[in-house]
A protein has these predicted regions:
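Non-catalytic cap/lid and distal C-terminal segments of serine-dependent acyl enzymes
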Residues: 1-140
Length: 140
């Protein structure tokens, strides 16, 4: 368990966190890269290829926060890592991430949270951070 973790980016970050909550006996660490806390409205999803911008779905964000709050005790023995950039879609993540941080801090859950200035929601930026994520899990 200590040597097995799960890492995901964007909605994959949500999936990684969910897998860890649902299977706490399996995963020792969880990495959430540019976690897509904000959801997406179906109307925004349909025009995304043309507009290339979303504002998110507050009800989805609140539901995710509630789910984590209700299950935070399942994360108590895991190493957690969260990050996001400051540009593009990633610019929407700071406030929801801060709410998640409050939940984790209130439950005395240990986690690492990093902000990467000028990083956008793109695989090339995720890749630049991957080594640092692994080193955090190995060193802690």
């Amino acid at each position: 368990r200590d040597n097995l973790g799960i890492i995901g980016a964007s909605m994959g970050g949500l999936s990684a966190l969910n897998m860890s909550i649902e299977n706490p006996e399996i995963f020792g660490f969880v990495g959430c890269i540019s976690t897509h806390w904000v959801g997406i409205k179906i109307s925004e999803y349909l025009i995304l290829p043309f507009r290339m911008k979303i504002s998110g779905d507050e009800s989805t964000t609140k539901a995710i926060q509630k789910y984590i709050k209700n299950n935070v005790s399942k994360l108590s023995s895991q190493k957690l890592y969260f990050d996001h950039g400051t540009v593009g879609l990633d610019s929407l993540y700071e406030n929801p991430q801060n709410e998640i941080n409050k939940i984790l801090l209130g439950s005395e859950i240990n986690f690492i949270y990093e902000v990467y200035p000028n990083h956008d929601h793109e695989p090339k930026f995720f890749g630049q951070r991957f080594k640092n994520i692994l080193l955090n899990f190995i060193d802690n």
